[in-house]
C-alpha cells in the first residue's frame, strides 16, 4: 500500500524537476528516453552538460541514494560521422550481422558498442568507467570524479603530475586492454584519458575495435605514438613503440613481424 502510494507520488513529480539545467539541445525523443532511464536507475536529477563534443554530450546524474553517473548522449550528426561509424562497425566480427539502415540506428549501435567495449574492459580489469545501462542513443556509466565534478583529462593535469609513473600506468592499461580485453582503443590521446587519484582511466571507447579488426595494429601503433608524443613533450622518458608492441599479443594478418622488421 505505502509502496504503491509512494510510486504514484514519484510519477506525479514533474518531469522538468529531473533537469537541473534546461538544455534546449535535447530533442523530445531523447528527453523521453532520459525520463525512462531516470525511473529505471532511480535518478533524481540530471545536471548541465560537462562536455559537448562533435558527436556526444555528457551529463552528470545523481541517484536518490547518492550515486553519480555519467550520461552520454549520442547525436545524429554529419555524414562524416556516418562514414566513421561504418568504417569501424564494418570489419568488426561482432557487428557482421547488423544490417545498417538509418543514421539513427547507427547511432544506437554506436552507443551499444561503447557499452559492450566498456563491459569488456571492466571484465578484464582495465581502468575505465564501469558501464551501467544503455538505452537507445544513451549510455550510462560510472562517473569519474567527485560530486558531479569530473576528473581532469590527461591534457589538463598539472605539469608536476605528468610523471614516468603515470606514463607506465597508462602503458600498463593499454597492455591489459590488448592482452586481456582484446581491444584496441583507436582514438587514444591525452583527450581520452582521465586522471583521478593519480590513476588513469581510459574513456571514449565507442570506436574501439577487436584485435582481429583489419586495422587494429595500425590503430594501436597510432595510439601508442600519441601517448609517447604527449609524455615526451613533458620531458618523460618513454619506451619505444616497437618495444611496447613486442609485449602485446596482437598478431593478425599484418602482424608484429612486419612491424618489427621495418621498425
Ligand atoms: P569530445 O568530442 O568532447 O571528446 P566525445 O564524443 O569524444 O566528446 P567522450 O570523450 O567520451 O565523448 O566524453 C567527453 C568528455 O566528457 C570527456 O572529455 C570527459 O571530460 C567527460 N567524461 C567522459 N566520460 C566521463 C565519465 N565517465 N565521468 C566523468 N566525465 C566523463
Ligand atoms: Mn573524447
Give the location of each predicted region.
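Conserved ATP-binding subdomain of kinase catalytic cores across diverse folds
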Residues: 21-150
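N-terminal targeting/trafficking signals and adjacent low-complexity tails
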Residues: 1-8, 24
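A short, surface-exposed helix-loop junction/capping segment
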Residues: 8-19
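Short glycine/proline- and charge-enriched loop/turn segments
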Residues: 95-101, 148-159, 203-210
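Conserved kinase catalytic-core helix
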Residues: 102-130, 134-135, 150-186, 191, ...
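C-lobe/activation-segment region of protein kinase-like
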Residues: 165-166, 179-185, 196-263
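Residues that form generic nucleotide/phosphate-binding pockets
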Residues: 33, 37, 157, 230, ...
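Short, glycine/acidic-enriched loop or turn micro-motifs at the edges of active sites
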Residues: 75, 145, 190, 195, ...
Amino acid at each position: 500500500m505505502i509502496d504503491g502510494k509512494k510510486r504514484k507520488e514519484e510519477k506525479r513529480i514533474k518531469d522538468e524537476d529531473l533537469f537541473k539545467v534546461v538544455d534546449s539541445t535535447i530533442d523530445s525523443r531523447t528527453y523521453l528516453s532520459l525520463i525512462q532511464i531516470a525511473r529505471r536507475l532511480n535518478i533524481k536529477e540530471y545536471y548541465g552538460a560537462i562536455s559537448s563534443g562533435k558527436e556526444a554530450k555528457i551529463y552528470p546524474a545523481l541517484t536518490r541514494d547518492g550515486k553519480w553517473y555519467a550520461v552520454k548522449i549520442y547525436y545524429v550528426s554529419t555524414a562524416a560521422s556516418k562514414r566513421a561509424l561504418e568504417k569501424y562497425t564494418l570489419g568488426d566480427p561482432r557487428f557482421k550481422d547488423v544490417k545498417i539502415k538509418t543514421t539513427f540506428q547507427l547511432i544506437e549501435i554506436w552507443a551499444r558498442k561503447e557499452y559492450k567495449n566498456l563491459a569488456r574492459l571492466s571484465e578484464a580489469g582495465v581502468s575505465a568507467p564501469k558501464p551501467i545501462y544503455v538505452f537507445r542513443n544513451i549510455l550510462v556509466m560510472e562517473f569519474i570524479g567527485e560530486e558531479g565534478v569530473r576528473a581532469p583529462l590527461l591534457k589538463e593535469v598539472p605539469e608536476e603530475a605528468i610523471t614516468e609513473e603515470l606514463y607506465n600506468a597508462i602503458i600498463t592499461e593499454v597492455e591489459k586492454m590488448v592482452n586481456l580485453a582484446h581491444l584496441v582503443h583507436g582514438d587514444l590521446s591525452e583527450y581520452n584519458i582521465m586522471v583521478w587519484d593519480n590513476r588513469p582511466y581510459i574513456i571514449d571507447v565507442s570506436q574501439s575495435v577487436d584485435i582481429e579488426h583489419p586495422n587494429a595494429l595500425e590503430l594501436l601503433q597510432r595510439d601508442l605514438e600519441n601517448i609517447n608524443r604527449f609524455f615526451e613533450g613533458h620531458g618523460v622518458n618513454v619506451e619505444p613503440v616497437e618495444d611496447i608492441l613486442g609485449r602485446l599479443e596482437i598478431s593478425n594478418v599484418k602482424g608484429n613481424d612486419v612491424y618489427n622488421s621495418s621498425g
